[in-house]
């Protein structure tokens, strides 16, 4: 990936996890291939991926996944950090959501804030996790699985 260019799509962990599966969803793989140079992940997603890896028992599968995650995922997708700008956006989102009574996971609001701070489209299968955030912000979401999203 050319790190001089800004990515347009921020991939959620469920999208990245799909790449790792032995039989990944065709639509997801096609979209990633089509937009590869326009895709990035963020630090909270990277943490979720590594956490999943570190929880695995030692063995061939863990060694394979470790190599794939560090050699392919890490090398192909720029990692967007949780910056001061994203922190301010997240604080605003959480305050707005609290006023509406809409619950949201702290990690989801961090991911959304990073997408908003970088003017990116969040790509996730879990669109329902971000519905309340969309209602109080200009967050754009795409579901590359093509289904209606999961809760």
Regions found by a protein language model. Name each.
Residues 43-45, 83, 145-148:
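Residues at the C-termini of beta-strands that transition into short coil/loop
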Residues 16-17, 47-50, 131, 142:
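Nucleotide phosphate-binding site architecture
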Residues 15-16, 45, 86, 110-111, ...:
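Alpha-helix capping/helix-boundary segments
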Residues 56-60, 98, 139-143:
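Short, hinge-like loop/turn segments at secondary-structure boundaries
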Residues 18-19, 52, 90, 133:
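Residues that scaffold the ATP/ADP-binding catalytic core of kinase and kinase-like folds
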Residues 1-4, 8, 112, 116-151:
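Acidic, PIN/NYN-like endoribonuclease modules and their adjacent C-terminal/linker elements
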Residues 1-42, 54-69, 150:
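Short, well-structured N-terminal submotif of metal-dependent ribonuclease cores
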Residues 2-4, 51, 78-121, 125:
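Active-site neighborhoods of divalent-metal-dependent phosphate/nucleic-acid chemistry enzymes
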